[in-house]
Amino acid sequence: MVQLDVEKTIEELTLGEKVALTAGIDFWHTAAVPRLNIPSLRMSDGPNGVRGTRFFNGVPAACFPCATALGATWDTKLLYEVGRLMGEESIAKGAHVVLGPTINTQRSPLGGRGFESFAEDGVLSGILAGHYCKGLQETGVAATLKHFVCNDQEHERLAVDSIVTMRAMREIYLLPFQLAMRICKTACVMTAYNKVNGTHVSENKQIITDILRKEWGWDGLVMSDWFGTYSTCDAINAGLDLEMPGPTRWRGTALAHAVSSNKAFEFVMDERVRNILNLHNFVEPLGIPENAPEKALNRPEDQALLRRAAAESVVLIKNQDNILPLKKEKPILVIGPNAKTAAYCGGGSASLDAYYTVTPFEGVAAQSQGEVTFSQGVYSYKELPLLGPLLKTDDGKKGFKFRVYNEPPSEPNRQLIDELHLESSSGFLMDYKHPKIKTFTFYVDMEGYFTPEEDGIYDFGVTVVGTGKLFVDDELVVDNSKNQRQGTAMFGNATVEEKGSKELKAGQTYKVVLQFGTAPTSDLDMRGVVIFGPGGFRFGAARRVSQEELISKAAELASQTSQVVIFAGLTSEWETEGYDRDHMDLPPGSDEMISRVLDANPDTVVVIQSGTPVTMPWAHKAKALLQAWFGGNECGNGIADVLYGNVNPAAKLPLSFPVRLQDNPSYLNFRSERGRVLYGEDIYVGYRYYEKVDLAPLFPFGHGLSYTTFSRSDLSLATTPEKPQLEDGEPITVTVSVTNTGSVAGAEIVQLWVAPPPTGVNRPVRELKGFTKVFLQPGETKKVEIVVEKKLATSWWDEQREKWASEKGTYEVLVTGTGDEVLKSSFEVEKTRYWLGL
């Protein structure tokens, strides 16, 4: 790669070459123009790790804690480090652009991708995203803020019209993008799938050009979300530089014709191409060649960072009687469906093949010096657990053979064209290629051998984008090849899981074969704009058991053990791109199991893993409760570090946890109704709503405990004289002394809130405006400083003037942290002023 003379290159490009540059050539790469030294660039997801170019059988990658976990750290320095490692992982995968971070707003606990965004509050989300992007882009890799804007649900996400007031859009949904860009002007922005107030964002000139480019002065590249382009002229004229993925659906000859007929002017094309070429120059110093090989890093220092991030994200919600930290020398009983499951990431674009994973059970067992006992408690899978890791090949290797043919099994003389060895029995074949396969229609036989450890009836399940028949010792057990039903897996393209059962004997080996036909062999009506090539498969199995039997056994064991910890929650099956949750509840049986174990042993520690809030009807019984999120590669070690006191928890909730779903402000206005969703709660998202109506959530935004105690004192506040025009340069500086009054070293998160004066418009009771994190030894005192611009601390969006309004009056400053102590001060705004810009 070489630095391009952008203006000269634009002059030398033909119209056809310009058109080609504005669309991808495949799922991850942009077009090249070799004669002008314009190479193809590679992009890669994304939200919590750099997957590379392959969903199927790809190169493993580092998996970071999910965004809500990182949001819980409230730690800008950590987010910067995470961003740098993300950049280094991207370079290892030969990718010039990372498709992240996601900074949408969790207006509902049910959003399928809620775990991908940092927080319900724009200040927390935007500041963390800015430091993450700063770290990432300092490696030379381009960051992509997404999904711009109001992409806050999965239901009908390609078509839904988000009806939102401009005030709410500015104060809630655009704010994290605005604040992130004040810290780091990212190289890229990705548009949302949805419409906003009647127009798809990818062709919404007001959002892309008027606000993003003109008002905020941003000059990077705007790309569509994958298959999120819906027009030729409207999108190009609105400011959408790049349609992804390729091959193009809307550009190509259609765009060339539009330019020749002045539906889109060539000078507009030049603007689009200019932004694409500027991106080339931004990433050129990386020196990543076209089609670079993908490598794994997995360095010890990276593992240490991932472990620290996992531990620092764990929120200590309750700790009555100082049950925590646990004693390493004492025996411990580990219970629950998440104990031996590595719930390390959510589903969809966030999913990847991690270098390794550590389950909570493994993390606890590695640190305990006493006996570690396990009880299942309950099973919480949505689909049957993957069978692949339990299989052996005919030559004794873990996993199964994956044999590819161009002809179906009914063809007696078909020729084997490819054979792979796989361990995961879930595969998305969108990027599988072989030179002898010319179409999306081909067939795969997957064969392995299963030796059960227990007698019993075993249930087998098959989910496909395509067709599938599962045989056990040549007996057809599951037929998912006809009368198929649409399900939610694999971005909503797959069937529901079809099941069958067979009685098996312990110690006996059975041959298991899945005969799979790719997507074109399915009889489902697969209408929709997103088509993922050959499709995919998933097959699982489990011994049929009684949940009541499991719960009773767990409760009995808990009554006999002094140290007990439950690991429960959700997994990537329950929280994933492609669909929203129907409710906030834990999987069936989990609440009953937790409640009965707590009755048997009230000192039981409960650890919940989920990316977004869940109901906890047993919370009043729990003396010790932690929220542990999806913690990445090192989730099990990170949780164990907190349980045993190696790490003193400091995390705070980045989301409000309502008592019940009906309490959340979007309850009446979530999901699409006849093609639209009304953002009826307006600016009252999350804590803004609960505080305004004086409704206590189960656990509030910003809550989190520590193994030590802190005090805050000596609050001082300094402002600068007001200028005629409100702009940057009028900082409010808040200084406070923080003391560790306990006996354990730990970190405190100091939160700065501002409460507005009474005005003629409804405003929240208070809003978060800044925060900082400080580490203190026992007895140590440090002064911390939080600086926020007056315009950001005081303003609301005036829809009549179409400007931010900073109204005169007395503004109260509140400083909070761990515990109930609140320090207060105030400052004056002498004159009402209005402003626009970043």
Curated annotation (Swiss-Prot):
What is the protein's major site of localization? secreted
Q: Has keyword Secreted?
A: yes
Which residues are reported to be glycosylated?
197, 493
User: What molecular functions are annotated in GO for this chain?
Assistant: beta-glucosidase activity
- Reply yes or no: does the keyword Metal-binding apply: no
Pfam families with a match to the protein in the record: Fn3-like, Glyco_hydro_3, Glyco_hydro_3_C, PA14
| Superkingdom to which the source organism belongs | Eukaryota
**Which example biological process does GO assign this protein?**
cellulose catabolic process
Which reactions are catalysed by this chain? Hydrolysis of terminal, non-reducing beta-D-glucosyl residues with release of beta-D-glucose
Task: Give the location in the cell.
Answer: Secreted
Q: What is its EC number?
A: 3.2.1.21
- Alphabetized InterPro entries for the sequence: Cellulose_deg_GH3, Fn3-like, Glyco_hydro_3_AS, Glyco_hydro_3_C, Glyco_hydro_3_C_sf, Glyco_hydro_3_N, Glyco_hydro_3_N_sf, Glycoside_hydrolase_SF
Domain called PA14: residue spans: 395-555
Q: Which residues form the active site?
A: 225
Q: Which Gene3D superfamilies match?
A: Galactose-binding domain-like, Glycoside hydrolase family 3 C-terminal domain, Glycoside hydrolase, family 3, N-terminal domain, Immunoglobulins
Identify the metabolic or biological route this protein is part of. Answer: Glycan metabolism; cellulose degradation
Q: Which PROSITE patterns match?
A: GLYCOSYL_HYDROL_F3, PA14
Q: Name one GO cellular component term.
A: extracellular region
* UniProt keyword terms in alphabetical order: Carbohydrate metabolism, Cellulose degradation, Glycoprotein, Glycosidase, Hydrolase, Polysaccharide degradation, Secreted
Q: Which SMART domains match?
A: Fn3_like (SM01217), PA14 (SM00758)
So what family is this one in?
A: Belongs to the glycosyl hydrolase 3 family.
Q: Its biological function?
A: Beta-glucosidases are one of a number of cellulolytic enzymes involved in the degradation of cellulosic biomass. Catalyzes the last step releasing glucose from the inhibitory cellobiose.
This protein's name: Probable beta-glucosidase I
Species? Aspergillus fumigatus (strain ATCC MYA-4609 / CBS 101355 / FGSC A1100 / Af293)
